[in-house]
């Protein structure tokens, strides 16, 4: 009697697991994460031959600001560069190796520039 209950609980637990979103790992390619419908996402190429994550963040920030200047309501966007997620918003750019994981400050706003967190003037 206990075995079927344990088996049923295990099946329910496995059914609730969903694969986590993985960022593309292509070298030198900057991506924007687009959401088509609830639960449907894909990565759009923003730029190729991007030398580093800072340049990708700058490209994504430029795209974010252009969207806002055209009347867009979403102040936060997500991108990816070489297997890392980039989360951009009014506070700056945060990075993580997983979509749902801890996000670490990467670049912050200082005036109209993005700078490393320790370089920003108070």
Predicted regions and their residues:
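Sec-dependent bacterial lipoprotein signal peptides
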Residues: 1-18
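Mitochondrial intermembrane space
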Residues: 18-122
């Amino acid at each position: 009697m206990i075995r079927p209950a344990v088996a049923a609980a295990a099946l329910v637990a496995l059914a609730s697991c969903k694969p986590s979103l993985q960022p593309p790992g292509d070298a030198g390619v900057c991506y924007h994460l687009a959401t088509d419908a609830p639960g449907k996402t894909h990565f759009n190429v923003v730029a190729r031959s991007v030398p580093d994550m800072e340049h990708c963040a700058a490209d994504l920030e430029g795209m974010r600001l252009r969207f806002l200047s055209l009347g867009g309501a979403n102040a936060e966007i997500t991108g990816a560069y070489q297997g890392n997620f980039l989360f951009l918003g009014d506070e700056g750019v945060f990075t993580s190796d997983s979509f749902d994981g801890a996000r670490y400050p990467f670049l912050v706003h200082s005036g109209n520039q993005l700078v490393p967190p320790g370089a920003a003037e108070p």
